[in-house]
Amino acid sequence: MLHSGKKSVKISWGMEKILISGMGIVSAMGNGVNENLQALRCNCSGIAPLRYLSTAHKEFPVGEVKMTDEEMISLLQIPENQPTTRTSLMGIMAVGEAISNANLQLDKSNHKLKIALINGTTVGGMDKSEQFYTDFLTNDTKNAYIATHDCGACTEMIADYFGIFSQVSTVSTACSSAANAILLGAELLKSGRADIVVAGGAECLTKFHLNGFNTLMILDKEHCRPFDAARAGLNLGEGAAYIVMEKAKENSRSFEQGKEEIILAGAANTCDAFHQTATSPQGDGAFLAMKKALEEAGISPEQIDYINAHGTGTQNNDLTEGIAIERIFGANIPPVSSTKAFTGHTTSAAGSIEAVISILSLQNNFIPNNLNFKEKMPELSFTPNFNDVAVEQNGNLKPQKSELRHVLSNSFGFGGNDTCLIFSKN
């Protein structure tokens, strides 16, 4: 599916439309679609001091989901002796909402349908591995520990909880994982290998994240400032989000009443393989991903109404992504914002969390603010979407455009693995 040498994945979209029939999300902003929407509209960031993860690095603010593992286990009514991980628990919560949102029944009425779960994650159950590491050498059940901690095991835990999936796959491409899960899900639908796909990603915050990104010296000790001249790095986060996809002509259920139908209009994945952790100076992978996604969607750059940027807040990403955006859009750059200042960088889950945010933007005709922005980057011609007086008395963000029809969402992973998704009103 993924190729190096600045090549890209292409999907033959044809005349068939991929309908988004449901979605679910758990993030630092809140649990569920409604809580996340309200947080976006009132400029309420979920970034806060560390509370749930035990680590020596208390100096870094993060975007944690505001629930303990025990609270999620109780809410989901999972037996206490059943192996679980924080990643799988958040995934179950988000998949459950997506299934409910799509009016998908968890009974035998779906037994003839080919329903696939495509999950993007990288650390899997590493939160448990870190807890058990110290007694690994002396504990007789060491194999039981390891067996439930890999990426695929987390996906299986999510699938087993619902019992409706005939196909289960795990995608692990770092910070583009969830976006690639959505892309793979679309391919399964187009090829007829699945009738319904639940695709997205889940990732919990671990010491591995904090220690690794701290070693790279790209963590900000303050709230991150994407596309700001004084940006100093990213804030890590955690969460899960999934969308339910199916061919529009086969859909017999309705999306949430009163909401416009949204389709996945185009998608593309590229890999420029420039560096293990850095992007190419001219943003070649990002440029090619956006270019190919636009071609697959059959729309011009001028038709994009909003770009949900990868926008991590690091020196490297924001500059090279900005250059790639300028190469694609020229002098007609649409509003751009990064929502990672709301959620933190949720790494493998970022692509699907931001896919849900993009869909919410389309359904509600608003553009999320680029929080914490103060000073324009001198290297770029555009400034991100920021309006510090954009909150009305009722707490809702004033729409930045009267109508949104096409939203582009970027997700870029280490190794130059770049994915672009385009969502449109049907």
Where in this protein do the model-derived segments appear?
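Conserved small-residue
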Residues: G22, L40, V95, L117, ...
